[in-house]
A protein has these predicted regions:
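Short, extreme N-terminal segment that most often corresponds to the first beta-strand
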Residues: 2-55, 257, 261-268
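Conserved aromatic-histidine-acidic binding/catalytic patches
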Residues: 27, 31, 116-124, 209-213
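N-terminal low-complexity, intrinsically disordered segments
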Residues: 29-100
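Short, surface-exposed beta-strand/loop "edge" segments at domain boundaries and coil↔beta transitions
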Residues: 32-37, 116-120, 153-154, 250, ...
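Short amphipathic alpha-helical segments
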Residues: 35, 120-131, 213-220
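Structural alpha-beta junctions
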Residues: 45-52, 130-145, 227-235
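Internal, hydrophobic cores of structured domains that mediate oligomerization or house catalytic pockets
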Residues: 77-172
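Aromatic/basic-lined ligand-recognition segments
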Residues: 150-240, 245-268
Length: 268
């Protein structure tokens, strides 16, 4: 990433979304939800986290992890189906999403309340992912996660596998759990766009009508997003990026094609 460090723009000059309330919704099939005791034990043993000030039970609970106040609440009803109708067709990471999600019977709300927290959005989403993974790993009836802010539907085993990237501080981030990457294929050209970078105080990114396969664009964009979030970089209109000294990809800010508002375009 040395080349990226030289060619990408400046360190973040805009205030990041610190201390905001973020949440996710694990989904369950059957009569049982998570066990608070098992979740706490997994957070300690698997992730090595210090969990303090635990109050509540399997229905509602709060506790602290470092500076973060965490709240868990089990809701004895499924998430309304209307919430998912517009995103099933785009949920390519969950093969049978519609069928399996329609069978869920209850869900939980996992919240980081952000009260007094000064940790970065990446640190907070990392913690949220660890919480979700601990719930999924310790609960046989859990089927997956709904990350509403990014319109992501994520199946259980995939979620657990991607979260394991957080065990190694030098590894890449589990971007797929935080940011939706839309892939548009048409004739011989493809486009990709992000939805969820705003959660980290960053601009959404689009690559429009590139002479590449959608899968190739996806593979190109992932390390860019990882670098932007890991290094807290703000891409600027008029700059260039590249993975080699010779590669200079122009960055342009303009009205988004697949999103509301503006986006940054990488011109391949």
């Amino acid at each position: 990433m040395g080349i990226l460090n030289n060619i990408f723009g400046k360190k973040n000059e805009k205030p990041e979304n610190k201390g905001q309330h973020i949440l996710s919704m694990p989904m369950f099939k059957g009569d049982r939800g998570y066990s608070l005791d098992k979740v706490i034990q997994d957070l300690k043993s698997y992730w090595g986290l210090k969990v303090d000030e635990i109050e509540g039970d399997d229905n509602t609970a709060t506790f602290k992890i470092d500076e973060e106040l965490v709240a868990l609440a089990l809701m004895p009803a499924p998430i309304p189906s209307a919430e998912f109708e517009s995103i099933y067709n785009y949920s390519y990471l969950w093969k049978d999403a519609e069928k399996e999600i329609q069978e869920h019977t209850q869900h939980a709300i996992v919240s980081l309340l952000g009260l007094g927290s000064n940790t970065s959005a990446v640190e907070r989403y990392s913690l949220l992912s660890k919480l979700n993974a601990s719930i999924l790993r310790t609960c046989e009836t859990a089927i997956g996660i709904y990350q509403g802010a990014s319109t992501l539907l994520l199946p259980k085993n995939l979620y657990i596998d991607f979260t394991d990237l957080l065990l190694d501080e030098d590894d890449i981030l589990p971007i797929q759990l935080w940011v939706y990457i839309g892939i548009i294929n048409s004739d011989e050209k493809s486009s990709v766009y992000t939805y969820g970078m705003k959660e980290f105080g960053k601009s959404e990114i689009e690559i429009i009508d590139a002479n590449m396969k959608g899968s190739e664009l996806y593979d190109f964009l992932l390390p860019v997003l990882d670098y932007v979030l890991q290094q807290d970089v703000t891409l600027q209109h008029g700059e260039t990026i590249g993975f080699t000294e010779e590669q200079k990809i122009k960055i342009t800010e303009s009205k988004a094609v697949f999103l509301d508002g503006n986006s940054l375009k990488l011109e391949l």
